[in-house]
A protein has these predicted regions:
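Solvent-exposed alpha-helices and their adjacent loops that cap or buttress functional pockets
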Residues: 1-4, 97-98, 134-136
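Active-site C-terminal subdomain of aminotransferase-like
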Residues: 1-84
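Short beta-strand-to-loop capping motifs
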Residues: 12, 107-111, 145-147
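Conserved PLP-binding catalytic core of the aspartate aminotransferase-like
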Residues: 76, 92-122
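A short linear hydrophobic-aromatic micro-motif
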Residues: 90-94, 128-132
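Short amphipathic alpha-helices in soluble, non-transmembrane regions
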Residues: 117-125, 157-162
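PLP-dependent enzyme catalytic core of the Aspartate aminotransferase-like
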Residues: 135, 139-167
């Protein structure tokens, strides 16, 4: 959806709602019964993050204007483009081709780049990448190929990375 974190959406079937009614300690966050009671009254059980709701409204307009199939195809094309470039430059994509995400490309940091230093360079060009998590923190880096990212953004990132490799 290309939104900041902090908003959850859920679809709950009649069967799941019936089951939720019989759960004695539903907690607060996932109490579908409480949420449904408030939904019927067009209210919420807690203060909602209104800027995110407005942002969701804008994003849904963008998504539907582009069309889901076109959006998914764009994400896939960007992921393939970046992955192909990375592999051609000796940096393997971490997942096997059949299992690769179309929304984020995770690449082995085979060049041994200091991702913090790389990001300092990239921010001068208005972009940044993310390193991996946990034990993969310095061994991988991630490039977003989703949301409002466009192929031109990927091409600009590739050009910047090629410039960085020459430094």
């Amino acid at each position: 959806l290309a939104l900041p974190p902090g908003l959850s959406l859920a679809g709950v079937s009649d069967r799941a709602m019936k089951k939720a009614e019989s759960v004695p300690f539903r907690g607060w966050y996932f109490d579908f019964v409480l949420l449904e009671k408030h939904r019927i009254k067009d209210s919420t059980p807690m203060t909602p993050v209104m800027p995110l709701i407005y942002a969701l409204d804008v994003q849904l307009d963008r998504i539907f204007a582009e069309g889901l199939e076109a959006r998914f195809a764009r994400h896939e094309a960007m992921a393939k483009r970046f992955g192909s470039w990375a592999e051609a430059n000796g940096m393997p994509v971490m997942a096997a081709p059949a299992y690769r995400s179309h929304t984020v490309c995770t690449v082995q940091n085979a060049k041994g780049w200091d991702i913090s230093a790389l990001n300092k360079f990239l921010t001068t060009k208005g972009m940044r990448i993310a390193n991996g998590y946990g034990e993969w923190k310095d061994k991988t880096y991630r490039v977003a190929t989703m949301g409002e990212t466009q192929m031109s953004d990927i091409e600009n990132l590739i050009a910047a990375l090629e410039e960085y490799m020459k430094l």
